[in-house]
Regions:
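Extracytoplasmic metal-acquisition and chelation regions
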Residues: 2-14, 19-306
Length: 306
């Protein structure tokens, strides 16, 4: 989320840190023995955690901080278990861009200065447009994900040189599976380029933009929803008019941050016969990144074809 939303990512209280300090060296020793053969990795979300597992396979021990598909990541509350995992991590993968600032703060408070930290937004090279805000949901941008995979491979190889070749091979295989996803986006662009769509949040915008689609949602609407603020009546009516007036072909709906105003958008779209494509910010249970993104792109293509 934009930097301002990091205020809603609750940090550890001093009491929690005191509790962590009392965890004891015996627990640390037991954990070290159980994972000594694996590289300890912490990912801010299960999206990045799954990518790490795809590359590290059985040579990594991955902790994903945010993994509940029913939870709004914007309001996540970090805890002492997260702090403990980050204090021991050799490799850390975060999204960056204000989405998960708690990771850097917890690394600092846990005095872990040696971890290799991969910041996906920095890897992407993306910046905020002039007069606008950065869309930090870079895991919906497949070229960025490919670069992140390379960084993960390199970090794991540094931590475990004996398995470097396997990490590189796995990263290459993972990136090869991204190519069909980009081809699907190119096909959508060829068949539906210029089509207007609506969103509830900027989450899917890298996917829709790569597919040649035009977002018609008032910026004030999606920004307010992303910030957890109320949408003004005027902006809400402008958004709803997109559906009643048949001005968009699809609504892409973030299920993880739904509320009364986004539900009104969903209801208006359905009432107008406009397809709704649900998306999430974290992996649904039982899915992996590649399967999840394949389903997202396929759902978008199917909706546009109706």
């Amino acid at each position: 989320m934009p930097l301002s939303t990091s205020r809603r990512l609750a940090l550890l209280t001093s009491a929690s840190l005191a509790l962590l300090a009392g965890c004891g060296s015996s627990a640390d020793s037991a954990d070290a023995k159980s994972t000594s053969a694996k590289v300890p990795v912490v990912a801010s979300t299960n999206v990045y955690g799954d990518i790490v597992r795809s590359i590290g396979a059985d040579k990594v021990d991955v902790t994903s901080v945010i993994s509940d598909p029913d939870q709004d990541p914007h309001s996540y509350e970090a805890d002492t278990q997260n702090q403990l995992a980050l204090s021991k991590a050799t490799v850390v993968v975060e999204n960056g861009g204000g989405y998960d600032d708690f990771v850097d703060r917890m690394l600092k408070s846990g005095h872990n200065d040696s971890a290799q930290v991969i910041n996906a937004v920095r890897v992407s090279g993306k910046t905020a447009p002039k007069g606008g805000e950065l869309n930090e949901h870079v895991w919906y941008d497949f070229p960025t994900v490919a670069r992140v995979a390379d960084r993960i491979s390199a970090a794991l190889a540094k931590a475990d040189p004996a398995d470097a070749a396997a990490f590189r091979k796995n990263a290459t295989a993972f990136k090869a599976e991204l190519t069909p996803l980009e081809a699907k986006e190119a096909r959508i662009k060829k068949e539906h380029g210029g089509a207007a769509v609506a969103i509830t949040e900027p989450v899917p915008l890298y996917m829709t933009e790569a597919s040649g689609l035009v977002n018609k949602t008032p910026a004030a609407f999606s920004e307010a929803i992303e910030e957890g603020d109320d949408v003004s009546p005027r902006i809400l009516q402008e958004s709803l008019a997109l559906f009643s007036g048949g001005k968009v072909k699809v609504l892409v709906y973030n299920e993880q941050t739904s509320g009364p105003q986004t539900e009104k958008s969903e209801a208006a779209a359905k009432a107008a016969g406009i397809p709704v494509v649900p998306v999430t910010e974290t992996l649904p249970k039982g899915e992996d990144y590649l399967g999840w993104m394949t389903a997202n792109v396929d759902a978008l293509a199917s909706a546009l074809a109706k």
